[in-house]
């Protein structure tokens, strides 16, 4: 092999090696920050009811569920809170020390991120309160009403209950009934 080919080969091998090392380090860093999402039922029973797919104690996970009514226990001297979270099945205990979100309350959906310290106990580092899809901050709602009013769109139009909407529904129903006969 002539010296020119050797130098090219060294450059190509060095580039491939560098890309492989960079990809490996990137994947390692990402794996350290991946928090798998589970429901309380999946923590207790395993994903797809497979006991081999339960999260391990010490694993960082995210849990989504509903706060069980009457389960919130607060420490009077600190910001420590403990509550039960469930979905349609068994519940798990979530420990959290910090200020809870304003929307946090019993019966409300939450997502907690933390470390599983026992098979059904999570020490959360972050608790997020979920709200339904109809929630809208008041400021945004007021702004939209202003814009819709200026465009000639009424509240009834937004809700689908205006006379125009009702007439359209009736026409559609008549058309469907005519096709069925």
From Swiss-Prot:
Keywords: Cell inner membrane, Cell membrane, Cytochrome c-type biogenesis, Heme, Iron, Membrane, Metal-binding, Signal-anchor, Transmembrane, Transmembrane helix. It is found in: Cell inner membrane. Residues 30-181 are periplasmic. One of its GO terms (biological process) is cytochrome complex assembly. SUPFAM superfamilies: Heme chaperone CcmE. Residues 135-166 are annotated as: Disordered. PANTHER family: CYTOCHROME C-TYPE BIOGENESIS PROTEIN CCME HOMOLOG, MITOCHONDRIAL (PTHR34128:SF2). Heme chaperone required for the biogenesis of c-type cytochromes. Transiently binds heme delivered by CcmC and transfers the heme to apo-cytochromes in a process facilitated by CcmF and CcmH. This is Cytochrome c-type biogenesis protein CcmE. It comes from Actinobacillus pleuropneumoniae serotype 3 (strain JL03). The lineage of its organism: Bacteria, Pseudomonadati, Pseudomonadota, Gammaproteobacteria, Pasteurellales.
């Amino acid at each position: 092999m002539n010296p020119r080919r050797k130098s090219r080969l060294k450059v190509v091998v060095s580039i491939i090696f560098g890309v492989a090392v960079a990809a490996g380090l990137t994947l390692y860093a990402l794996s350290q920050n991946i928090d798998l999402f589970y429901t309380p039922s999946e923590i207790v029973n395993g994903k797809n009811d497979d006991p081999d797919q339960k999260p391990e104690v010490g694993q960082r996970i995210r849990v989504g569920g509903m706060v069980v009514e009457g389960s919130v226990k607060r420490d009077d001297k600190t910001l420590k809170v403990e509550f039960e979270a469930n979905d349609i099945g068994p519940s798990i205990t979530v420990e959290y020390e910090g200020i809870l979100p304003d929307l946090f309350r019993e019966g409300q959906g939450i997502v907690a991120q933390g470390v599983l310290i026992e098979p059904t106990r999570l020490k959360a580092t972050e608790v997020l309160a979920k709200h339904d899809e109809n929630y809208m901050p008041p400021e945004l709602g007021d702004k939209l009403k202003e814009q819709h009013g200026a465009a000639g769109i009424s509240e009834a139009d937004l809700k689908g209950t205006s006379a125009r909407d009702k007439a359209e529904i009736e026409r559609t129903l008549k058309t469907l009934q005519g096709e069925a006969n």
